[in-house]
Curated annotation (Swiss-Prot):
InterPro entries: QueA, QueA_dom1, QueA_dom2, QueA_sf. This is S-adenosylmethionine:tRNA ribosyltransferase-isomerase. Transfers and isomerizes the ribose moiety from AdoMet to the 7-aminomethyl group of 7-deazaguanine (preQ1-tRNA) to give epoxyqueuosine (oQ-tRNA). Pathway: tRNA modification; tRNA-queuosine biosynthesis. Signal peptide: none annotated. It catalyses: 7-aminomethyl-7-carbaguanosine(34) in tRNA + S-adenosyl-L-methionine = epoxyqueuosine(34) in tRNA + adenine + L-methionine + 2 H(+). Monomer. Its EC number is 2.4.99.17. Belongs to the QueA family. GO terms for cellular component: cytoplasm.
Length: 339
């Protein structure tokens, strides 16, 4: 028996060529590994089969929209820097990560006459900055508008290439509408209009918003996972989704962000706020029944969330099968359905 609290228990070996650097096209041809808990059986389908296999349930998606959060600039010295915006704060301040040495007071220059000043260095390696243009402080919506012109799609660190115009389409769900994420809720990337229409005919669909932060890629550093401090992300639950969660209808959460949002609301009854819920085999889901998700990094909080549904042993067994069957992994990869 593996120790559910030991970080090493969530490790597995993944051949580099199984990390997807672009999505399967057409989307419905992406592969789908299905695990049926009642039958304790695994079978292999494609996303186009999803509506045929899904039990009766309501479906909840995350409608967050990924911003072009990566920008390139220079210090006054001329040295180049790279910034990843993470989260808006109060008083027009922003939390971000900066590649390149900076200190409090460092001024950074970007295209379109945009400037930023570093106000604080945080212990988690993030930086607090304030943006200006023509000496006027920029608010969040103004910053998002500027990012749409000078920013780059914030591809995950394991996709080792520059972003392209295709990524602006690929790395965004078709129902994305509320700006603020710096990473996509990747289970949602598999859906096209036809698939959504088909599901709408047979299932009740609703939406939450959880702005996925850069913390989703942060590794667990403690050998005992109970010592991990979970990152916090803004969420808001629509009235329809709230009513569905408050009912006793069975629920499918599309993606780990939806799961955390559903479970955080179920525990706190707060329809809006900041979610820092860490699900793992000793902190199981209390409300959500089924999970649709991608295949996640070793030792990540995301694979631990999967294990909160089906246990550590079964999770690692299924991941081994997925590798052997050459499923594609991570953000642009294939999917897994737990029913």
């Amino acid at each position: 028996m593996s120790d559910i609290f030991s970080l090493s228990s969530y490790d597995y070996k993944l051949p580099q060529d199984l990390i997807a650097t672009a999505p399967t096209m057409p989307k419905e041809e992406a592969r789908l590994l299905v695990y049926d808990r009642q039958k304790d059986s695994v079978f292999h389908l494609k996303f186009k089969n999803l509506s045929e296999i899904l039990p009766e349930c309501a479906i909840i998606f995350n409608d967050t929209k990924v911003i072009k959060a990566r920008i390139y600039g220079r210090k006054d010295s001329g040295a180049e820097i790279q910034m990843l915006l993470n989260q808006p704060l109060q008083n027009s301040l922003f939390s971000c990560y900066i590649r390149g040495k900076v200190k409090v007071g460092t001024k950074l220059k970007f295209d379109l006459g945009v400037e930023a000043e570093v106000l604080e260095l945080k212990d988690d390696s993030s930086r607090i900055v304030k943006f200006k243009k023509n000496e006027q402080i920029l608010n969040t919506s103004e910053i998002y508008n500027i990012l749409s012109h000078i920013g780059h799609v914030p591809l995950p660190p394991y996709i080792k290439r520059e972003d392209t115009p295709d990524d602006e389409i690929w790395y965004q769900s078709i129902f994305a509408k509320n700006e603020g994420a710096v990473a996509a809720p990747t289970a949602s990337l598999h859906f096209n209009d036809q698939m959504l229409d088909d599901l709408n005919k047979t299932h009740d669909i609703s939406y939450i918003t959880l702005h996925v932060g850069a913390g989703t890629f942060k590794g667990v550093e403690h050998c005992d996972i109970r010592e991990h401090k979970m990152h916090s992300e803004f969420y808001c639950i629509s009235k329809k989704a709230k009513n569905i969660i408050d009912s006793d209808i069975k629920l499918l959460g599309v993606g780990t962000t939806v799961t955390r949002c559903i479970e955080y609301y179920y525990r706190t009854k707060q329809p809006k706020g900041f979610c820092d819920l860490f699900l793992h085999p000793d902190n199981k889901p209390l409300r959500q029944d089924f999970l649709l998700t991608n295949f996640h990094l070793p030792k990540s909080t995301l694979i631990m969330l999967v294990a909160s549904f089906i246990g550590l042993e079964k999770t690692m067994e299924i991941y081994k099968q997925a590798v052997e069957n050459r499923y594609k992994f991570y953000s642009y990869g294939d999917g897994m359905l737990i029913i």
